[in-house]
Amino acid sequence: MDLSKYKNKGLTGLQNTGNSCYINSCLQLLSNLYELNELMDNLENKNVNNNENGIILSEWNSLRKMMWKENCIVAPLRFCKVVQFVSKKKNNELFSGFDQNDMSEFLFFIIDCFHNALKREVNMNITGKVKNSLDKLAMSCYEMMRKMYKKEYSEILDIFYGISVTIIKSKENDNEILSNSCEP
């Protein structure tokens, strides 16, 4: 990834429109995730679902482009109205008005919208030979991912989601794995 295109750009402030400071904080964070910017820059090659999630992703992409076009102050009024509309449509009253809210809750909401806008069915194949216990663990993690996300995969999973691995080892033999589990 060529980070030079970001040098001295994206130094844009967001004007507070009511109690939107939690939204503005989240937008600044998302705007400076270069992996997300790369994905958004290549959206023309992706099919965006034509629903409320697609609306919010499209509106975010427009605002993001404006934020990176020149260093200035932007009032994200249209984006906030789209968030309120989508929030009401999803029966999520939390972001449907002008009440103060928690930035982390909004971040989960917006990431979920992005994922649902891009999700699609994919064919996930796992190849290779298991040579050691680490390979075996990796295979079980990939198998879990294949089962969970083959019908609704998006690149958002690659950027924002991880895998939690729990390993229980033998007390007598540290090399003996009694159990392991992989969870998203």
Task: Kindly label every feature range from the protein language model.
Residues 1-184:
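Deubiquitinase catalytic domains
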